[in-house]
């Protein structure tokens, strides 16, 4: 993937996020500095650490979206965690190291996807060969087992493996007739003529969730994976269309072709050098003026987070992971506190401070119309599925934006999220009646917005509950 300059990164962010230019500029610089670091000598690379960011601003102004889009631009492993989910060591709750384990898990998923894409052509060939054999099976002949084989089958059952009686204990004989039939099936398969035909395949049974595995995972161990590697794989039969069966078989063949040790190693490197951890609601772990046991625990969480942010090694089931060069982005509303209320050591680990501004009416107008995935474009696409062309006049858009701004000012300010609740209420009848409407076009005007939302806006109690 081509390296993008800070200006190019900001330009991409502008396609999805309105305003907040200072925040976009700061994260773009932090991201590009990673590329600069990789061009230096190994010794200098080790010395240069990421400049972590602390974003302060009301809810719904784009803090999370900036970080999420940033990660997608460079295809970096990204996890979002909430600071309130963590507890001090010794208390019930998630330990802070779990954020690093989650990051590595995401990196493994990304690396596995990349490797699967690399081997997909060969895996597809093997999957098609299996489909041909299933659609044109050979002549079955009973396989004679010697006494030693019977003993091995019995031991397999005792160890938890599949019952030999349920397995395919027949030998397949491929006659000339079967061979010709398979050639015919292969030709039809390549032309896509058998996609809807059903076929029965054997697939590995997914391991059941085990609470003990989760507990072991928090200690960097995965007993479930260890046992799955030792114990025989159980298989179940599933009847699927050829189209769906091919995808399942491609996945199974891909797993056989890739080297998971390499995947895990690359995932760890990817996490260490490119990983982004977004810590939301960091203001909620600031202790208040009145100290009690709960407040002490909040400060304890800060002290537990500190070594992760400043650089340490965390044991995961894929191997030890260094957090020295992971980029941390913390965010919070700081409505009842300020960043300087964090413990001094943690403040020092977030040297770049960015304040995000509350959204104005003009911002709401742009949010409704400009982004690639804007809310109006989403509703227009939904109605298009019913064969209806949905049109919003500029006056209607201005009115919706004004209502969102006024409701935020009069009640709790939830930023751009207010637009979703307003639009859902505004278009409730249209969405309900849509499939039965015969008209090909619906225009949302300012008068329609007034009619649908006027009574709710005038009644403050209804506004709080509905909008």
Swiss-Prot record:
This protein's GO CC annotations: HslUV protease complex
Gene Ontology biological-process annotations: protein unfolding; proteolysis involved in protein catabolic process
InterPro entries: AAA+_ATPase, ATP-dep_Clp_protease_ClpX, ATPase_AAA_core, Clp_ATPase_C, HslU, P-loop_NTPase
Name of one Pfam family that matches: ClpB_D2-small
Subunit field text: A double ring-shaped homohexamer of HslV is capped on each side by a ring-shaped HslU homohexamer. The assembly of the HslU/HslV complex is dependent on binding of ATP.
Function: ATPase subunit of a proteasome-like degradation complex; this subunit has chaperone activity. The binding of ATP and its subsequent hydrolysis by HslU are essential for unfolding of protein substrates subsequently hydrolyzed by HslV. HslU recognizes the N-terminal part of its protein substrates and unfolds these before they are guided to HslV for hydrolysis.
Protein name: ATP-dependent protease ATPase subunit HslU
Organism this protein belongs to: Lactobacillus helveticus (strain DPC 4571)
